[in-house]
């Protein structure tokens, strides 16, 4: 029997609780989901650690949205955030840095890896926008990362199945491939079967309505991209369970 592992991308403490109750082995805690995930606050990490008693806690270290080319000040910020995550009891951290020409920024990654000693490290989906996936794979292995979160350089992991399979074969057990982006209860079995990958990253979110009775929908807290203040996406126990059971029930 294959030993599958399930990581839920959580956007709040509430989502962490649902992920744990649904059977997730690990969560990746993120703020700023519309930007692809940014470093969560001190309080969010502390509370997530408090409620996660059986599920491992990984924290994304990403000071902003946008590209993965970081200034010296941003690198210093990331180093401080890694230390904060460690002090608050995180089991792992998630980050990735690129050069101007789309390669892995090995010198910066070495700094972050040194700061992360003793923690599990995932190289995140910066991998999916790097120039050469094969070269990047070898560099990330040499850096000592534990896993790579990737969609196979496609918009979703399902579309990235060919490269995901190739990467797993190239890695040959030297690093874990974590398939993520668009993974759900409808496609997880196909991705597992066709790639041979055994770790999966998914959000299992649903939209819930605000509890506000008074609403002024003419005013938005965001900029040009309108996101309603009166509904939000949260991980639900049901969707976590459904996604996990869709693959474990087929064993």
Swiss-Prot record:
It holds the Pfam family CutC. GO terms for cellular component: cytoplasm. Keywords: Cytoplasm. Its main location: cytoplasm. InterPro entries: CutC-like, CutC-like_dom_sf. The keyword Metal-binding does not apply. One of its GO terms (molecular function) is copper ion binding. It comes from the Bacteria. It is found in: Cytoplasm. Belongs to the CutC family. This is PF03932 family protein CutC.
């Amino acid at each position: 029997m294959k030993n599958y592992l399930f990581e839920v991308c959580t956007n709040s403490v509430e989502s962490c609780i649902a992920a744990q109750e649904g059977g997730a082995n690990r969560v990746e805690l993120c703020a700023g989901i519309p930007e692809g995930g940014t470093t969560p606050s001190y309080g969010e990490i502390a509370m997530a650690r408090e409620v996660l008693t059986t599920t491992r806690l990984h924290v994304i270290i990403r000071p902003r949205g946008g590209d993965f080319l970081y200034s010296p000040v941003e690198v210093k910020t990331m180093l401080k955030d890694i230390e904060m995550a460690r002090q608050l009891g995180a089991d792992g951290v998630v980050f990735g840095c690129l050069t101007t020409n789309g390669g892995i920024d090995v010198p910066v990654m070495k700094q972050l890896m040194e700061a992360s000693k003793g923690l599990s490290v995932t190289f995140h989906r910066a991998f999916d926008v790097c120039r050469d996936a094969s070269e990047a794979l070898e560099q990330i292995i040499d850096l000592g990362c534990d896993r790579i979160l990737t969609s196979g350089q496609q918009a979703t992991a399902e579309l990235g199945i060919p490269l995901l399979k190739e990467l797993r074969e190239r890695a040959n057990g030297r690093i874990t491939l974590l398939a993520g982006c668009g993974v759900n209860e409808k496609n997880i079995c196909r991705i597992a079967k066709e790639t041979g990958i055994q770790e999966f990253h998914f959000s299992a979110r649903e939209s819930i309505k605000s509890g506000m009775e008074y609403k002024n929908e003419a005013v938005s807290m965001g900029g040009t991209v309108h996101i309603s203040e009166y509904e939000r996406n949260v991980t639900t126990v049901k969707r976590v369970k459904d996604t996990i059971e869709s693959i474990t029930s087929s064993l």
